[in-house]
Structures are given as C-alpha cells and as structure tokens.
Amino acid sequence: MVLIKLNIIMAFMLALTGVLIYRSHLMSTLLCLEGMMLSLFIFMAAVITHFHMFSISMMPLILLVFSACEAGVGLALLVTISNTYGNDQVQNLNLLQW
C-alpha cells in the first residue's frame, strides 16, 4: 500500500509541476489539472477502501463530478479564447476583464 500511495503522490506532483511549467497555454494547464484530479480520485478511493471508511464512499464520485464541471468550464473558456484571439495563450485572459 505504501508503494501505491507513493506512486499516486508522485503522479500528483508531476501534474502539479506540469501546471507550473506549462502555464502559458490553457490547454496544457487544463490537461495537467485533470491529471491532478484523477490522482486525487485514485488516492481517495484507495484510502477509503484501505481503512474501510465506507460511510464516505461517495466522496471520490463527488470529486469526479466537480472535475467534470471544471473541465467543461475550462474547455468552454478555451473555445471562447481561441475563437476570439486565435490562440490559447493565458495572457489573453487579462484582456477579458471589463
């Protein structure tokens, strides 16, 4: 179980460094955020099954629902930015302010 937790934490850290490194493009940032959410989902499911905490067994599913909503909003923002400006640079987000 320790090796599984270590691999999941390493996947989360790898996705976090991807967010920090590839923050100039919105698509790369969204993909790294999805990797972070999936590693959190796997970690929560593994901890719940390991410690037999079945009273909170819906929490990973709720996390997946919020992750899907976040991905939908992010992709809608990506389509809007790419249609307006022709690229997915994050610097264009400052231009959307009123």
Swiss-Prot record:
Primary location class: mitochondrion
Q: Name one GO cellular component term.
A: respiratory chain complex I
Q: Does the keyword Mitochondrion apply?
A: yes
- Keyword terms of this UniProt record: Electron transport, Membrane, Mitochondrion, Mitochondrion inner membrane, NAD, Respiratory chain, Translocase, Transmembrane, Transmembrane helix, Transport, Ubiquinone
Q: How does it sit in the membrane?
A: Multi-pass membrane protein
Annotated compartments: Mitochondrion inner membrane
Q: Which reaction does it catalyse?
A: a ubiquinone + NADH + 5 H(+)(in) = a ubiquinol + NAD(+) + 4 H(+)(out)
The record's listing under InterPro entries reads:
NADH_UbQ_OxRdtase_chain4L/K, NUOK/Mnh_C1-like
Q: Which residues cross the membrane?
A: 1-21, 36-56, 61-81
Q: What does this protein do?
A: Core subunit of the mitochondrial membrane respiratory chain NADH dehydrogenase (Complex I) which catalyzes electron transfer from NADH through the respiratory chain, using ubiquinone as an electron acceptor. Part of the enzyme membrane arm which is embedded in the lipid bilayer and involved in proton translocation.
User: What's the subunit arrangement here?
Assistant: Core subunit of respiratory chain NADH dehydrogenase (Complex I) which is composed of 45 different subunits.
Protein's name in the database = NADH-ubiquinone oxidoreductase chain 4L
